Amino acid sequence: MLTRKQYDLLRFIHERLKETGVPPSFDEMKEALDLRSKSGIHRLITALEERGFIRRLPNRARALEVVRLPDSVAPGLATPRSASRGFSPSVIEGSLGKVRPAADDDEGAGQVVTVPVMGRIAAGSPISAIQTRSHTLNIPPEMLGSGEHFALEVRGDSMIEAGILDGDTVLIRKCDTADTGDIIVALVDDEEATLKRLRKKGASIALEAANPAYETRIFGPDRVRIQGRLIGLMRRY
């Protein structure tokens, strides 16, 4: 049985992963739970890990995975969904060629959306512009939401502190605008594609890595075109 703070943190991590595909930072978790220090977050995460609700990926910064949600919680904390069943994660089959939802009794659980994989994207030094379609993935619609989508295979380690690792597959919603702080696919000078966090500095655009080994790159607005925004991530073990 979870305490209120443990339950609140687990739900916050779960909702952030659903929305963005990457876990929240310790500062974001501290603010969300109105705690004064990160040590309290460390204790809560350790308790959730010991109880089998989350998993920390070793030697990787900011890498948390929700394994399950509780079937029972402390009195007064349960929502109808959490009280009735546990978490049903997406199951990624071996080749990443197909993705299917875990078993669920909900109507329409077997439906999928076909998403094209448009080659590789650099999470490091920019590489050549996005390639043509290489193959497709079948994605549960609840992972996507509205709009048009495509997927890219990540190469490089510049976004590791955002929980995005070399070899991951990122799900991108097509768009040509984004808010500062969003993780985007940026096309630089119509030649180089890169996955970075968007920062707007006056009339300039900054592409910020999530790895201190990489410098933030700043461009004039006419040199960068936004191709899409990160909405999810898939990883093969």
Swiss-Prot record:
Catalytic activity field: Hydrolysis of Ala-|-Gly bond in repressor LexA
Full protein name: LexA repressor
GO terms under biological process: DNA repair; DNA replication; negative regulation of DNA-templated transcription; proteolysis; SOS response
Gene3D superfamilies, sorted: Umud Fragment, subunit A, Winged helix-like DNA-binding domain superfamily/Winged helix DNA-binding domain
Xref: PANTHER family: LEXA REPRESSOR, LEXA REPRESSOR-RELATED
Residue positions of the active site: 158 (for autocatalytic cleavage activity), 196 (for autocatalytic cleavage activity)
Keyword Hydrolase: yes
